[in-house]
Amino acid sequence: MRNLNIYNIRKWYKMLAGTSILHVNQGVGKIYSKNDIGGYYNDLTEKVLRGKNLQKVKIPRLQLKNGQEVVFPIAVFQYGLGAYDLYLIEKKEIYINKFKLTADWALANQEENGAWNNFFFNNPEAPFSAMAQGEGASLLIRAYKQLGMIEYLEAAEKAIEFMIMPVGDGGTTLLRAGAHVVDEG
């Protein structure tokens, strides 16, 4: 019963009613290809289309149960990947602008070691996530391909290096039964 509070009830209602931007259908990407870096393999376009700010170019924010708004890196990366797919499909300038904004945010907010501080608001002792690292790298590789700035590629490489670094060294990879497993934090 600890999780039963007005914040979670609202969150669950939005999820069940199909109005949550955090919980959208994520089938196979609409223009995903195994042969080319283009569309993302998950369909994240609803992350962009369902948002309140469809006609605005701004970084998405997450509202915490205490009412505070934070920028959650995974949400930014998924929004950017969805915007890029929409740009590839529709060729609308608004989508490439949203995509570029998220890629620039990723550059500006990446730590020196290649990480993004993903769970700073609820788990500051273990704020890193392999999911954030992978999605951030995916966003930045597409930004490099589309926009040509070498800084995007360099940041993607740093993100992957951090993702495969062992947890004991600060990264997000665990060794279990001789296999490397990426950790969600």
Please describe what each predicted stretch is.
Residues 1-185:
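Glycan-recognition and catalytic cores of secretory/periplasmic carbohydrate-active enzymes
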